Swiss-Prot record:
Role: Catalyzes oxygen-dependent 5-hydroxyuridine (ho5U) modification at position 34 in tRNAs.
EC number: 1.14.-.-
Active-site feature positions: C176
NCBIfam families associated with the record: PRK00142.1-4 (NF001136)
Residues covered by the Rhodanese domain: 122-216
Lineage: Bacteria, Bacillati, Cyanobacteriota, Cyanophyceae, Synechococcales
Catalysis performed (reactions): uridine(34) in tRNA + AH2 + O2 = 5-hydroxyuridine(34) in tRNA + A + H2O
Name of the protein this chain belongs to: tRNA uridine(34) hydroxylase
């Protein structure tokens, strides 16, 4: 079986989210797509999979609507369903920072293309922050990146208030899996008064796709939020499992986090 997996998001003022939810639910069901779509007044965040023709038709119909015109998305070919079912939900935020009043559609950090990221990493004045959660960072990251030690994205503002703002850095560069978290985090940092904020365009996955393994600076694997669990520097799927007891990604038969024996699992308990 050959399927196409797409991931996309956009911060855009979105009215009548319930109407959009029903339309997307009906469209995806008719096309036989699986995955998750989150809608909020701040925009859309989605990961979907289906056959090539169905994905192409979905994107064509979606982009006919002004809020989603010229939508950027990442795609990958997978051999099995990365999602078990379809979920279309309305939430207060498409990625939960706990700041629904924040408006990333108006102001975010400067996007840095993958081709320019390595040069930025060499700037000693840049404070590099991995915006992901600690269990994701445990699998891999960029050298010298700060781990905020968060268990969820909503913890990030506390890290900023307690660790970053007492001595505000002149420049901050941030990255995450696909770009959405660092885009929203960059809006938060700008609101807190940090003047120069950079974000990796398209996130780690875009960087790994654009930069050859012998030239990229990524170390380890990258956690992804589907049944692949993680990808390596070549965007191949290593043999990670999710511990059924604590939900952490592991490669051994015993979970190093909770010491429980690991049976093959594709979703947290």
């Amino acid at each position: 079986m050959s399927l196409v997996l797409i991931n996309f998001y956009r911060f855009v003022a979105l009215g009548d989210c319930d109407r959009w939810r029903q339309w997307l639910q009906d469209l995806c069901t008719a096309l036989g797509l699986r995955g998750t779509i989150l809608l909020a007044p701040e925009g859309i965040n989605a990961g979907l999979a289906g056959n090539t023709e169905a994905i192409a038709q979905f994107l064509s119909e979606l982009q006919q609507h002004p809020p989603f015109a010229n939508l950027s998305f990442k795609s990958a070919t997978v051999t099995d369903w990365p999602f078990a079912r379809l979920k279309v939900k309305v939430k207060p935020e498409i990625v939960s920072l706990g700041c629904p009043e924040l408006n990333p559609a108006e102001r975010t950090g400067t996007l840095v293309a993958p081709q320019d990221w390595n040069q930025l990493l060499q700037d000693p004045e840049v404070v590099l922050i991995d915006v992901r959660n600690r269990f994701e960072i445990a699998l891999g990251s960029f050298p010298r990146a700060i781990d905020p030690q968060t268990d969820r994205f909503r913890d990030f503002p506390r890290f900023v208030q307690e660790q970053l703002l007492p001595q505000p850095p002149a420049k901050v560069a941030m990255f995450c899996t696909g770009g959405i978290r660092c885009e929203k985090a960059s809006a938060y940092l700008l609101e807190q008064g940090i003047e120069t904020v950079y974000q990796l365009e398209g996130g780690i996955l875009n960087y790994l796709e654009a930069i050859a393994p012998e030239e990229n600076h990524w170390q380890g694997d990258c956690f992804v939020f589907d049944e692949r669990i993680a990808v390596d520097r070549q965007l191949q799927t290593p043999q990670h499992q999710l511990c059924p007891a604590c939900g952490q990604p592991v490669v051994a038969t015993t979970c190093s986090h909770c010491q429980d024996s690991v049976q093959a699992s594709s979703s947290p308990k």
